[in-house]
Amino acid sequence: MQHESPIIRRKSTRIYVGDVPIGDGAPIAVQSMTNTRTTDVEATVAQIRALEKVGADIVRVSVPTMEAAEAFKLIKQQVSVPLVADIHFDYRIALKVAEYGVDCLRINPGNIGNEERIRSVVDCARDKNIPIRIGVNGGSLEKDLQMKYGEPTPEALVESAMRHVDHLDRLNFDQFKVSVKASDVFLAVDSYRLLAKKIDQPLHLGITEAGGARAGAVKSAVGLGMLLSEGIGDTLRISLAADPVEEIKVGFDILKSLRIRSRGINFIACPSCSRQEFDVIGTVNALEQRLEDIITPMDVSIIGCVVNGPGEAEVSHLGLAGSNKKSAFYEDGKRQKERFDNNDLVNQLEAKIRAKASMMDSENRIEIKVQD
């Protein structure tokens, strides 16, 4: 039940993606990206709504063609979450989606074109009050930087980013955030650390092309965890070769683990052993599925025996400590007279958790310090 994070966040400027504040101490925004064909409007809208349901603050949509831009117009009309248009190669697509109400433009300086094309995009963004994300990726650096450095390095990624930052500065445009993603954890982490020392703009974090659901989640947790623990990062995306909904869940789990931002239940559960008095794994899995709709930040400990059960329960909003036939139940750290039948734990716990959630402030947010 700890509500204060020891992390002091890097001070950054404030921009808005739609109505979502980014930077300057705002809650770290969690976003994902659709993996449907953008021209399949029905499927894309359905996926965006699924992402919004699990807490996505922002959703990015790839817009590779003018046909996709026309589809984007229809998609935007049917969803409420802010949308970022992912633009590569053809700057005219950025101009088109700007007409259709896009909330943010993501462009890659390695392939968007010459300075005049960038100027056209920036002028349009300024006129329509649309922020830009400069998205540098280790796999698509400019050719001259590939020649200069021989391979992606932190210096190469940051030089690419700073070229575009300087260009936007010359155009008197400051409504932007920056990312320097790489698939290698150390390359990404060192790139973000270097960039954080050079600019005050918000930083969008990500380990790009991280891998499948399990390996990608681990890689992202390691890389982003290092950066977030140092106070670096204002938005994030977990890149998984999996259902995008899982990206949002993992993103919130990372923030929750660092006590930066909580959404939903933080289950504290033992891996179980021969001392367990009930099926811990089955109980936790069932509750996670049943209670996905709960957004209230809450710690729930489910421990199968009395070795660690009481101790964990005493620092949780709700807790269960396994005992023979009936297990001990705790609320706000205090043991209750009521005991739970080990053969019906899921139903009993679900009822208690839902009742507790209805009593708590669902808008509660963990306090985070920001550097002066």
UniProtKB/Swiss-Prot annotation:
Protein name listed in UniProt: 4-hydroxy-3-methylbut-2-en-1-yl diphosphate synthase (flavodoxin)
Family statement drawn from the similarity comment of this UniProt entry: Belongs to the IspG family.
Species whose genome carries this gene: Vibrio parahaemolyticus serotype O3:K6 (strain RIMD 2210633)
Lineage: Bacteria, Pseudomonadati, Pseudomonadota, Gammaproteobacteria, Vibrionales
Domain of life: Bacteria
Coiled coil: none
Bilayer-crossing regions: none
GO MF term set: 4 iron, 4 sulfur cluster binding; 4-hydroxy-3-methylbut-2-en-1-yl diphosphate synthase activity (ferredoxin); 4-hydroxy-3-methylbut-2-enyl-diphosphate synthase activity (flavodoxin); iron ion binding
This protein's pathway: Isoprenoid biosynthesis; isopentenyl diphosphate biosynthesis via DXP pathway; isopentenyl diphosphate from 1-deoxy-D-xylulose 5-phosphate: step 5/6
Sorted UniProt keywords: 4Fe-4S, Iron, Iron-sulfur, Isoprene biosynthesis, Metal-binding, Oxidoreductase
One of the protein's GO biological processes: isopentenyl diphosphate biosynthetic process, methylerythritol 4-phosphate pathway
